[in-house]
């Protein structure tokens, strides 16, 4: 009996941080025919249940674990005999032209059957104008942030063989490693500190917090490590090959990837560029370890006594909230007339009022004229009406925005356009002007948001796999995870006024919300903008606790073309913050009973 007939070992794939987990269910039986990805057993951690799938279609010969067994990565759980042909291994290719990565497994997506491209003869790919490659993939994804790994995983699910190029040691990009995720962990800690202090007004007093920066950093890093480990597992499960190193294009179908061992040339048929962005650094600012960007701020190397945040946008204000809660005296300086440019001023006001009570100072309409590093401190000089005298700070955080990485990829050799700001212009299918090269995320223009990147990544992957898809989202929500949070989506009031767009508006103040009063956070409000004729939702904004979670209802309403009555007539649970969205809609319709609004005329 051959190995395929006797059964091939099936082992537990990598599970991230979960090294010792119990088996809670056996989902297959000996003699059962299973399809690829059918669940064989279910494991349970303290946070989630995990199904271990069949890696290929076949007949179960043995089940080698039972309910209650504690197992981990690599544990032998079953043996499965192949039905039909075993997976095909490509024939070796002459080393002068490289090796070819391929997989001929077929998969089904709805009614569309996608076949992974067969092994490609290197001689057919390498032309006179193309250098030889060391490895070839039908699809290469350049960058493993939210847009990149989403594109890679979706493409693999659709049957493509994917190479994922990433320069960092871990997957997840800026968002997961040094952005969205670690910052939200620290913002949660900051909120707990502030809420504990506020409870003294209600008869519950705590002592001053004892802050152990080393343990706080370790907790933040554990969260990041769990998620990056999860991405590694997902890549392995999907057979996405990760190629690590600094990368640059060398031709229309080749990318050179350099690491400590040298340079490899990766060939591809199609490529999705998801190379992200980097922080902008102000000209004239000295190179000093006390002058940091958002990545440095998240490292929590120290708890400075006094810190200046240059930039009053989302990143600067979020990090200001963290350091203020940890005991640092924070000053924010913003060149624009107000904080958080792009957001309606009325939404920013409750946040600014709270921040002014916690921060040392907030300066708007003020320019940083000079930054000098001295042995004692960082001295900063300001310009503008009402500018303070030169000040000395222990830390200076540069948070003046980010720039796309499109200009650092050498992608011009492919014929792809790079605009003056470093963006790669794309169409609604996320294609650049070179049809086999796509771009998603920060390099593709538009708001630099992880949730936009993931949607674009899916579109690009599906188009690359031959599906008819386009990025057709009507709106993309924005969230500042400050305290209070600020979130908005769709048409803003400022945009409507500037563009002369007619609109109707209704707002519900949280001071009239039982839920917001119960949690002692009455400073917020919810507002909605409507088409004055059809009453359809055009946009909305929320400031207050968990605004980032609440804005999704407004986003869905806009996507579905809902009007005020659709929202108002939807029963919302009481008492909740989510019902403030319904109350705002009712206010526009004139049916609200939780406030008295005199009738006009």
Tell me the role of every PLM-derived stretch.
Residues 288-304, 390-463, 557:
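FAD-site-proximal beta/loop scaffold in flavoenzymes
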Residues 1-42, 51, 55-57, 103-104, ...:
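Acidic, low-complexity mobile loops and tails
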Residues 130-147, 303-315:
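Beta1/beta-strand and adjacent pyrophosphate-binding region of the FAD-binding site
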Residues 140-142, 247, 265-276, 309-310, ...:
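Short hydrophobic core segments
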Residues 142-144, 151, 156-168, 174, ...:
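Flexible, glycine-rich terminal cap/loop adjacent to redox cofactors
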Residues 35-53, 72-86:
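Short hydrophobic beta/alpha edge segments that flank linear recognition/processing sites
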Residues 116-121, 125-137, 153-303, 336-340, ...:
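Glycine-rich flavin
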Residues 15, 26-34, 65-71, 84, ...:
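Acidic, glycine-anchored pre-beta loop/turn
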């Amino acid at each position: 009996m051959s190995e395929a007939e006797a059964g091939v070992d099936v082992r537990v794939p990598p599970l991230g941080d979960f090294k010792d987990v119990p088996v809670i269910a056996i989902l297959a039986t000996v003699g059962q025919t299973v399809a690829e990805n059918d669940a064989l057993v279910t494991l349970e951690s303290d946070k989630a249940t995990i199904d271990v799938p069949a890696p290929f279609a076949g007949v179960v010969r043995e089940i080698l674990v039972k309910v209650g067994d504690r197992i981990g990565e690599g544990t032998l759980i079953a043996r499965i005999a192949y039905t039909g042909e075993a997976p095909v291994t490509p024939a070796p290719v002459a080393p002068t032209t490289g090796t070819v990565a391929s997989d001929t497994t077929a998969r089904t997506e709805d009614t569309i059957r996608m076949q992974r491209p067969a092994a490609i003869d290197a001689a057919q790919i390498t032309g006179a104008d193309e250098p030889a490659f060391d490895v070839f993939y039908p699809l290469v994804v350049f960058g493993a942030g939210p847009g990149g790994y989403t594109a890679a995983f979706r493409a693999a699910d659709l049957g493509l063989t994917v190479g994922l190029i990433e320069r960092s040691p871990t997957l997840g990009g800026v968002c997961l490693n040094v952005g969205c995720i670690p910052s939200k962990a620290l913002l949660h800690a900051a909120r707990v500190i502030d809420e504990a202090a506020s409870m003294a007004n209600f008869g519950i007093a705590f002592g001053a917090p004892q802050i152990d920066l080393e343990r706080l950093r370790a907790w933040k890093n554990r969260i990041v490590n769990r998620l990056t480990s999860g991405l590694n597992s997902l890549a392995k499960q999907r057979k996405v090959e990760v190629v690590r190193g600094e990368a640059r294009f060398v031709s229309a179908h080749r990318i050179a990837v350099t690491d400590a061992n040298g340079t490899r040339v990766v060939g591809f048929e199609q490529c999705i560029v998801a190379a992200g962005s980097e922080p902008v650094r102000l000209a004239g600012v000295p190179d000093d370890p006390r002058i940091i960007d958002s990545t440095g701020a998240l490292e929590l190397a120290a708890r400075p006594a006094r810190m200046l945040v240059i930039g009053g946008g989302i990143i600067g204000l979020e990090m200001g909230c963290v350091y203020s809660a940890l005991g640092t005296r924070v000053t924010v300086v913003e060149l624009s007339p107000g904080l958080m440019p792009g957001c309606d001023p009325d939404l920013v006001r409750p946040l600014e009022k709270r921040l002014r009570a916690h921060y040392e100072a907030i300066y708007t309409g003020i320019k940083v004229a000079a930054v000098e590093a001295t042995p004692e401190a960082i001295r900063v000089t300001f310009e503008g009406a009402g500018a303070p005298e030169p000040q000395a700070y222990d830390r200076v955080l540069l948070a003046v925005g980010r720039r796309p990485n499109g200009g650092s990829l050498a992608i011009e050799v492919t014929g792809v356009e790079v605009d003056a700001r470093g963006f790669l212009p794309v169409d609604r299918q996320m294609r650049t002007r070179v049809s086999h090269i796509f771009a998603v995320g920060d390099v593709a223009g538009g708001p630099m948001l992880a949730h936009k990147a993931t949607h674009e990544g899916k579109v690009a992957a599906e188009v690359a796999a031959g599906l008819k898809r386009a990025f057709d989202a009507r709106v993309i929500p924005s969230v500042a995870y400050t305290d209070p949070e600020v979130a908005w989506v769709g048409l803003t009031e400022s945009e409507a006024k500037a563009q002369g767009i007619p609109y109707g508006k209704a707002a519900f103040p949280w001071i009239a919300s039982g839920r917001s009063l119960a949690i002692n956070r009455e400073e917020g409000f919810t507002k909605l903008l409507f088409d004055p004729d059809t009453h359809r939702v055009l946009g909305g904004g929320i400031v207050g606790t968990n605004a980032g979670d609440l804005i999704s209802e407004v986003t869905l309403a806009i996507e579905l073309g809902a009007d005020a009555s659709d929202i108002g007539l939807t029963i919302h649970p009481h008492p909740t913050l989510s019902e403030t969205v319904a109350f705002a809609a009712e206010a526009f319709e004139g049916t609200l009973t939780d406030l008295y609004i005199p009738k006009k005329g």
